[in-house]
Amino acid sequence: NVIRNISEKEGHDWRLMSAIAYHESRFTPDITSRSGAKGLMQIMPSVARQFDVPAGDMANPETNIWLANKLMSKIKSTLRFPAGTSDKDRMSIILACYNSGIGHVNDARRLARVNGEDPNSWEVVARYLQLKAQPEYYESEAVKCGRFTGSRQTLAYVNDVIGRYDKYCRIARR
């Protein structure tokens, strides 16, 4: 299994990466979204550029999976969770970044911090992602990426991928 081999080599749980692939493309390698995301893992061209991968190579399943793993690693290292953060909170916040971009999630985390709440709690971050559609939140000095109207889709994405990951964990060993 290509997803398993690449994910294990890159230090990620192949079952999570498979859950992402299922949600993103239903394992269809030659799909392109309306927004320009490509392949099994629905990678944006800007991500390919970050990792010096030519746009023409993005549809290659192995390259696409490798890019998704690299993106997950970059998100994880950028977020710098403290030691006490639960695995579920960590995974949910990382998946939200994968789906909506790290900027909106970081805005939600900054809003949580400014309001005295836990920026490492998915429940809190999810609430602030939703609130970023309202001017009193997206006009805050803590917000760098402006208004966010995609929270419903992002929250559904996180729930769906984690639900599928949980199923994969029940039926397949790591």
What function would you assign to each model-found segment?
Residues 19, 42, 94-97:
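Soluble periplasmic/extracytoplasmic beta-strand elements of cell-envelope proteins
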Residues 12-17, 22, 35-38, 90, ...:
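Extracytoplasmic
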Residues 4, 18, 45:
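Short glycine-/small-residue-rich flexible loop motifs, especially phosphate/cofactor-binding loops
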Residues 2, 10, 49-63, 67-70, ...:
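Non-catalytic cell-wall polysaccharide-engagement segments
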Residues 31-50, 114, 122:
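Short, surface-exposed glycine/acidic/tryptophan-bearing loops
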Residues 1-8, 29-30:
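N-terminal export signals and maturation junctions of secreted/periplasmic proteins
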Residues 28-31, 82:
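A short, acidic/glycine-rich surface segment
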